[in-house]
């Protein structure tokens, strides 16, 4: 059953395109917006526009940052361990490790994993950027690259691919410990489990 309002139906269809959002949830969100004050709806509209216009990838680590704030605050941060780079799949994974308050090194965000079935190859993720970063003068301070990808088939494939590229550089490549459920995404793992996985990492 469809609404008689084409505007509401259009909004429902757009919400339903978001990950994890079905039609029923899209309907609830649409009804919520319909009942909100115009000023609140305008704030949401502005936030959606801003995130596309003002957010960029950090020129160093590829994490998200604002235009005019590049490199990002983590890459510029004082007190970070410059000898370690933790390689993750997506920006939410950076937040997950930062919440543990245990890891104080740097990061590199791949923005995906190698997945031939989905048509995603090594050139489609930020592997070249990692290699270029390590070849720069600042990159020569790095003694360990920690592979912290989700324990999926695609994640493991990416870990193996990247580690083979890095080993000739003389950099120690490690992987976070098992204990994270197979198929789980790091952004949904609790801080204690992530801390143990980081502490128990092994050399590849």
From Swiss-Prot:
Belongs to the RecR family. Residues 83-181 form the Toprim domain. It holds the Pfam family RecR_HhH. Keywords: DNA damage, DNA recombination, DNA repair, Metal-binding, Zinc, Zinc-finger. It comes from the Bacteria. GO terms for biological process: DNA recombination; DNA repair. InterPro entries: DNA_Rcmb_RecR, Rcmb_RecR, TOPRIM_dom, TOPRIM_RecR. A zinc finger (C4-type) spans 58-75. This is Recombination protein RecR. The keyword Cell membrane does not apply. CDD domains: TOPRIM_recR. GO terms for molecular function: DNA binding; zinc ion binding. May play a role in DNA repair. It seems to be involved in an RecBC-independent recombinational process of DNA repair. It may act with RecF and RecO.
């Amino acid at each position: 059953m469809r609404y008689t309002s084409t505007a509401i139906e259009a909004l429902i269809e757009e919400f339903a395109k978001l990950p994890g959002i079905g039609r029923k949830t899209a309907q609830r969100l649409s009804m919520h917006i319909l009942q909100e004050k115009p000023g609140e709806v305008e704030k949401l509209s502005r936030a959606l526009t801003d995130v596309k216009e003002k957010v960029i990838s950090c020129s160093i680590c590829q994490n998200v940052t604002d235009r005019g704030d590049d490199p990002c605050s983590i890459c510029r941060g004082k007190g970070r361990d410059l000898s370690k780079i933790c390689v993750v799949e997506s920006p939410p994974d950076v937040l997950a490790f930062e919440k543990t308050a245990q890891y104080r090194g740097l990061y590199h965000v791949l923005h995906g994993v190698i997945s031939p079935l989905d048509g995603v190859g090594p050139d489609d993720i930020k592997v070249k950027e990692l290699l270029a970063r390590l070849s720069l003068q600042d990159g020569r301070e790095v003694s360990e690259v920690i592979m912290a990808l989700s324990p999926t088939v695609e994640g493991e494939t990416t870990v193996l691919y990247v580690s083979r590229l890095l080993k000739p550089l003389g950099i120690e490549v490690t992987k976070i410990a098992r204990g994270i459920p197979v198929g789980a995404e790091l952004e949904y793992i609790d801080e204690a489990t992530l801390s143990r996985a980081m502490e128990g990492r092994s050399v590849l």
